[in-house]
Protein backbone atom coordinates (compact mmCIF):
# COMPACT_ATOMS: atom_id res chain seq x y z
CA UNK A 1 0.00 0.00 0.00
CA UNK A 2 1.28 3.46 -0.87
CA UNK A 3 0.51 6.90 0.52
CA UNK A 4 0.95 10.03 -1.60
CA UNK A 5 1.23 13.70 -0.74
CA UNK A 6 1.90 16.98 -2.51
CA UNK A 7 2.92 20.44 -1.34
CA UNK A 8 4.84 23.53 -2.35
CA UNK A 9 7.04 26.16 -0.71
CA UNK A 10 8.32 29.58 -1.74
CA UNK A 11 11.67 30.80 -2.91
CA UNK A 12 12.98 33.88 -1.12
CA UNK A 13 15.25 36.89 -1.41
CA UNK A 14 17.73 38.32 1.06
CA UNK A 15 17.43 41.41 3.21
CA UNK A 16 20.20 40.42 5.66
CA UNK A 17 22.54 37.47 5.12
CA UNK A 18 22.91 35.75 8.51
CA UNK A 19 26.38 34.27 7.99
CA UNK A 20 28.24 37.19 9.63
CA UNK A 21 26.16 37.48 12.81
CA UNK A 22 23.62 34.61 12.80
CA UNK A 23 20.89 37.25 12.52
CA UNK A 24 19.07 37.47 9.23
CA UNK A 25 16.10 38.77 7.29
CA UNK A 26 14.46 37.59 4.07
CA UNK A 27 11.27 37.88 2.02
CA UNK A 28 9.17 35.17 0.38
CA UNK A 29 8.76 35.47 -3.39
CA UNK A 30 6.10 34.14 -5.73
CA UNK A 31 8.34 31.42 -7.16
CA UNK A 32 7.52 27.93 -5.95
CA UNK A 33 9.18 24.58 -5.40
CA UNK A 34 6.80 21.61 -5.58
CA UNK A 35 7.25 18.22 -3.93
CA UNK A 36 5.49 14.92 -4.66
CA UNK A 37 5.97 12.22 -2.04
CA UNK A 38 5.07 8.54 -2.18
CA UNK A 39 5.47 6.40 0.95
CA UNK A 40 5.34 2.64 1.26
CA UNK A 41 5.74 0.06 4.01
CA UNK A 42 7.44 -2.21 1.47
CA UNK A 43 10.68 -0.22 1.68
CA UNK A 44 12.85 1.46 4.29
CA UNK A 45 14.97 3.54 1.91
CA UNK A 46 14.45 7.09 0.61
CA UNK A 47 15.01 8.02 -3.01
CA UNK A 48 14.91 11.64 -4.09
CA UNK A 49 14.80 13.11 -7.57
CA UNK A 50 15.21 16.75 -8.60
CA UNK A 51 13.34 17.21 -11.86
CA UNK A 52 15.61 18.52 -14.60
CA UNK A 53 18.77 17.89 -12.53
CA UNK A 54 19.47 14.17 -13.03
CA UNK A 55 22.69 14.15 -10.99
CA UNK A 56 21.61 16.67 -8.34
CA UNK A 57 22.34 16.06 -4.65
CA UNK A 58 19.13 14.71 -3.12
CA UNK A 59 20.42 14.29 0.45
CA UNK A 60 18.37 17.25 1.72
CA UNK A 61 14.98 16.10 0.47
CA UNK A 62 15.62 12.51 1.51
CA UNK A 63 16.63 13.62 5.01
CA UNK A 64 13.52 15.84 5.19
CA UNK A 65 11.27 12.81 4.55
CA UNK A 66 13.22 10.75 7.05
CA UNK A 67 12.86 13.33 9.84
CA UNK A 68 9.07 13.52 9.44
CA UNK A 69 8.69 9.75 9.66
CA UNK A 70 11.13 9.62 12.57
CA UNK A 71 9.11 12.29 14.41
CA UNK A 72 5.94 10.20 14.24
CA UNK A 73 7.73 6.89 14.88
CA UNK A 74 6.65 5.48 11.51
CA UNK A 75 8.80 2.95 9.67
CA UNK A 76 8.39 3.45 5.94
CA UNK A 77 10.44 4.27 2.88
CA UNK A 78 9.54 6.16 -0.22
CA UNK A 79 10.31 8.58 -2.99
CA UNK A 80 10.20 12.34 -3.35
CA UNK A 81 10.33 14.28 -6.59
CA UNK A 82 10.82 18.05 -6.52
CA UNK A 83 10.39 20.51 -9.36
CA UNK A 84 11.14 24.17 -9.03
CA UNK A 85 10.55 27.62 -10.46
CA UNK A 86 13.46 28.75 -8.26
CA UNK A 87 16.93 28.68 -9.89
CA UNK A 88 19.12 26.25 -7.93
CA UNK A 89 22.26 27.37 -6.05
CA UNK A 90 21.62 31.01 -6.93
CA UNK A 91 20.94 32.55 -3.50
CA UNK A 92 17.16 32.35 -3.92
CA UNK A 93 16.63 29.81 -1.13
CA UNK A 94 16.05 26.75 -3.29
CA UNK A 95 17.24 24.50 -0.45
CA UNK A 96 14.86 25.97 2.13
CA UNK A 97 12.00 25.71 -0.36
CA UNK A 98 12.83 22.08 -1.17
CA UNK A 99 13.01 21.10 2.51
CA UNK A 100 9.76 22.87 3.41
CA UNK A 101 7.88 21.45 0.43
CA UNK A 102 9.12 17.92 1.12
CA UNK A 103 8.19 18.09 4.80
CA UNK A 104 4.68 19.34 4.02
CA UNK A 105 4.20 16.76 1.27
CA UNK A 106 5.30 13.97 3.63
CA UNK A 107 2.87 15.22 6.28
CA UNK A 108 0.17 15.28 3.59
CA UNK A 109 0.93 11.67 2.68
CA UNK A 110 0.69 10.63 6.32
CA UNK A 111 -2.41 12.71 7.06
CA UNK A 112 -0.49 14.36 9.90
CA UNK A 113 0.21 17.97 10.88
CA UNK A 114 2.91 19.89 12.71
CA UNK A 115 2.93 23.36 14.21
CA UNK A 116 4.29 25.67 11.47
CA UNK A 117 7.43 26.68 13.38
CA UNK A 118 8.13 23.04 14.24
CA UNK A 119 7.94 22.17 10.54
CA UNK A 120 10.32 25.03 9.73
CA UNK A 121 12.79 23.89 12.39
CA UNK A 122 12.63 20.36 11.04
CA UNK A 123 13.65 21.69 7.63
CA UNK A 124 16.50 23.63 9.21
CA UNK A 125 17.72 20.45 10.89
CA UNK A 126 17.53 18.57 7.59
CA UNK A 127 19.56 21.32 5.90
CA UNK A 128 22.23 21.16 8.61
CA UNK A 129 22.33 17.36 8.44
CA UNK A 130 22.67 17.53 4.66
CA UNK A 131 25.48 20.10 4.89
CA UNK A 132 23.82 22.63 2.56
CA UNK A 133 23.79 25.54 5.01
CA UNK A 134 26.15 27.31 7.40
CA UNK A 135 23.76 28.89 9.94
CA UNK A 136 20.78 26.58 9.36
CA UNK A 137 19.13 29.31 7.26
CA UNK A 138 16.22 29.74 9.67
CA UNK A 139 15.57 33.18 8.14
CA UNK A 140 15.29 31.73 4.65
CA UNK A 141 13.16 28.83 5.88
CA UNK A 142 10.72 31.21 7.61
CA UNK A 143 10.44 33.42 4.52
CA UNK A 144 9.85 30.32 2.39
CA UNK A 145 7.19 28.98 4.76
CA UNK A 146 5.32 32.06 5.99
CA UNK A 147 5.89 34.52 3.14
CA UNK A 148 6.12 38.26 3.73
CA UNK A 149 9.30 39.76 5.19
CA UNK A 150 10.80 38.02 8.22
CA UNK A 151 13.54 39.02 10.66
CA UNK A 152 15.11 36.19 12.67
CA UNK A 153 17.79 35.09 15.10
CA UNK A 154 19.23 31.95 13.54
CA UNK A 155 21.25 30.98 16.59
CA UNK A 156 18.12 30.59 18.72
CA UNK A 157 15.70 29.85 15.84
CA UNK A 158 13.54 32.80 16.87
CA UNK A 159 11.16 34.53 14.46
CA UNK A 160 11.63 38.10 15.72
CA UNK A 161 9.35 39.93 13.32
CA UNK A 162 7.15 39.34 10.27
CA UNK A 163 5.73 42.05 8.00
CA UNK A 164 3.50 41.91 4.94
CA UNK A 165 4.44 44.25 2.12
CA UNK A 166 3.03 44.61 -1.40
CA UNK A 167 6.06 45.01 -3.65
CA UNK A 168 7.35 43.70 -6.94
CA UNK A 169 10.63 41.80 -7.00
CA UNK A 170 13.10 41.83 -9.89
CA UNK A 171 15.81 39.17 -9.88
CA UNK A 172 18.96 38.94 -11.98
CA UNK A 173 20.20 35.35 -11.99
CA UNK A 174 23.61 34.90 -13.70
CA UNK A 175 24.26 31.66 -15.57
CA UNK A 176 26.34 30.08 -12.83
CA UNK A 177 25.83 28.54 -9.43
CA UNK A 178 27.23 29.24 -5.97
CA UNK A 179 26.69 26.80 -3.10
CA UNK A 180 26.18 28.26 0.39
CA UNK A 181 28.25 25.53 2.03
CA UNK A 182 31.32 26.70 0.06
CA UNK A 183 31.11 30.32 1.21
CA UNK A 184 34.09 32.18 2.70
CA UNK A 185 32.85 32.32 6.30
CA UNK A 186 35.92 34.13 7.65
CA UNK A 187 35.50 37.05 5.26
CA UNK A 188 31.80 37.21 6.09
CA UNK A 189 32.42 37.30 9.84
CA UNK A 190 34.69 40.34 9.41
CA UNK A 191 31.57 42.24 8.33
CA UNK A 192 29.74 41.72 11.63
CA UNK A 193 29.71 45.33 12.97
CA UNK A 194 28.28 46.69 9.72
CA UNK A 195 25.85 43.80 9.20
CA UNK A 196 24.56 44.59 12.70
CA UNK A 197 23.77 48.10 11.44
CA UNK A 198 21.82 46.62 8.54
CA UNK A 199 19.98 44.29 10.92
CA UNK A 200 18.95 47.26 13.10
CA UNK A 201 17.57 48.95 9.98
CA UNK A 202 15.53 45.81 9.24
CA UNK A 203 14.17 45.74 12.80
CA UNK A 204 13.04 49.35 12.24
CA UNK A 205 11.24 48.36 9.03
CA UNK A 206 13.82 50.04 6.78
CA UNK A 207 14.08 46.92 4.64
CA UNK A 208 15.30 48.56 1.44
CA UNK A 209 18.13 50.43 3.16
CA UNK A 210 19.03 47.27 5.06
CA UNK A 211 19.24 45.07 1.99
CA UNK A 212 21.27 47.58 -0.01
CA UNK A 213 23.83 47.91 2.78
CA UNK A 214 23.86 44.11 3.08
CA UNK A 215 24.45 43.78 -0.65
CA UNK A 216 27.48 46.03 -0.81
CA UNK A 217 28.99 44.40 2.27
CA UNK A 218 28.65 40.83 1.06
CA UNK A 219 29.63 41.58 -2.54
CA UNK A 220 32.90 42.88 -1.12
CA UNK A 221 33.43 39.93 1.21
CA UNK A 222 32.50 37.21 -1.27
CA UNK A 223 34.03 38.67 -4.42
CA UNK A 224 30.90 39.55 -6.39
CA UNK A 225 30.62 42.60 -8.63
CA UNK A 226 28.59 45.56 -7.40
CA UNK A 227 27.89 46.68 -10.98
CA UNK A 228 24.44 45.04 -10.97
CA UNK A 229 23.52 46.92 -7.80
CA UNK A 230 24.91 50.22 -9.07
CA UNK A 231 22.84 50.00 -12.25
CA UNK A 232 19.74 49.49 -10.09
CA UNK A 233 20.57 52.49 -7.89
CA UNK A 234 21.04 54.65 -11.00
CA UNK A 235 17.43 53.80 -11.91
CA UNK A 236 16.21 55.05 -8.53
CA UNK A 237 15.87 51.64 -6.87
CA UNK A 238 16.13 51.91 -3.07
CA UNK A 239 16.41 48.23 -2.14
CA UNK A 240 18.78 45.90 -4.00
CA UNK A 241 21.15 43.20 -2.77
CA UNK A 242 23.16 40.16 -3.54
CA UNK A 243 20.74 37.39 -2.63
CA UNK A 244 22.15 34.97 -0.09
CA UNK A 245 25.69 34.03 -1.04
CA UNK A 246 24.97 34.78 -4.69
CA UNK A 247 25.28 34.81 -7.55
CA UNK A 248 21.73 36.21 -7.99
CA UNK A 249 20.72 39.76 -7.12
CA UNK A 250 17.22 40.86 -6.12
CA UNK A 251 15.51 44.25 -5.87
CA UNK A 252 12.32 45.41 -4.14
CA UNK A 253 10.47 47.86 -6.39
CA UNK A 254 7.06 49.20 -7.41
CA UNK A 255 5.42 48.12 -10.68
CA UNK A 256 6.71 51.01 -12.78
CA UNK A 257 10.24 50.66 -11.46
CA UNK A 258 10.11 46.91 -12.14
CA UNK A 259 9.69 47.57 -15.86
CA UNK A 260 12.54 50.07 -15.90
CA UNK A 261 14.94 47.85 -13.96
CA UNK A 262 14.09 44.80 -16.06
CA UNK A 263 15.18 46.61 -19.22
CA UNK A 264 18.40 47.80 -17.59
CA UNK A 265 19.35 44.38 -16.23
CA UNK A 266 18.48 42.69 -19.53
CA UNK A 267 21.14 44.87 -21.17
CA UNK A 268 23.95 44.37 -18.66
CA UNK A 269 26.04 42.38 -21.11
CA UNK A 270 26.28 39.59 -18.52
CA UNK A 271 24.96 36.11 -19.27
CA UNK A 272 21.90 35.41 -17.15
CA UNK A 273 18.16 35.90 -16.94
CA UNK A 274 15.89 38.51 -15.40
CA UNK A 275 12.90 37.21 -13.44
CA UNK A 276 9.89 39.35 -12.54
CA UNK A 277 7.90 38.27 -9.50
CA UNK A 278 6.54 39.78 -6.28
CA UNK A 279 6.62 39.32 -2.52
CA UNK A 280 4.31 36.45 -1.61
CA UNK A 281 2.54 37.34 1.65
CA UNK A 282 0.40 34.20 1.78
CA UNK A 283 2.99 31.62 2.72
CA UNK A 284 2.85 28.00 1.71
CA UNK A 285 0.29 25.25 1.80
CA UNK A 286 -0.54 21.80 0.60
CA UNK A 287 -1.58 21.69 -3.05
Swiss-Prot record:
HAMAP family: Shik_kinase_arch (MF_00370). Keywords: Amino-acid biosynthesis, Aromatic amino acid biosynthesis, ATP-binding, Cytoplasm, Kinase, Nucleotide-binding, Transferase. Its EC number is 2.7.1.71. It catalyses: shikimate + ATP = 3-phosphoshikimate + ADP + H(+). It is an enzyme of class 2 (transferase). Pathway: Metabolic intermediate biosynthesis; chorismate biosynthesis; chorismate from D-erythrose 4-phosphate and phosphoenolpyruvate: step 5/7. It is found in: Cytoplasm. This is Shikimate kinase. Belongs to the GHMP kinase family. Archaeal shikimate kinase subfamily. The keyword Transferase applies. ATP binds at residues 87-97. GO terms for cellular component: cytoplasm. The lineage of its organism: Archaea, Methanobacteriati, Methanobacteriota, Stenosarchaea group, Methanomicrobia. The gene is aroK. GO terms for molecular function: ATP binding; shikimate kinase activity. Pfam families: GHMP_kinases_N (PF00288). One of its GO terms (biological process) is aromatic amino acid family biosynthetic process.
